[in-house]
Amino acid sequence: MDVLHELDAFVTWQGGFDYYFAHQEEPAVWDQAQSDLRKIGLSAAAELFGVARDLFLSTDHFTEEQAVVNRYLSDMRELNTRWRDYVPALHQALAHWRSERGLEEFGLKGW
């Protein structure tokens, strides 16, 4: 669940998916974040995360073609906007996870 805290911090509160993937460069962490989203019942958010990841990976971030840059930024902004639909449920799940009962559900000792 710690990867979801990082995902929330970068995507929700800082710079969106583009910012997240640029700062968290480990594909294993991306896979864990997507898996954890599914684990907490946010399968649609996990799919959206996958679309954003694929867009990030398939884009030449060093291109000088303005049309490519504009299309990428437009598509990423749309995905960031759609992400907002899942933020309340994500925050609820993260709050539960931080609670004593939530920690115990994950096999960790409560506060």
Question: Residue spans of the language-model regions?
Answer:
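Extended, alpha-helix-rich binding/interface surfaces that flank or overlap catalytic cores
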Residues: 1-111
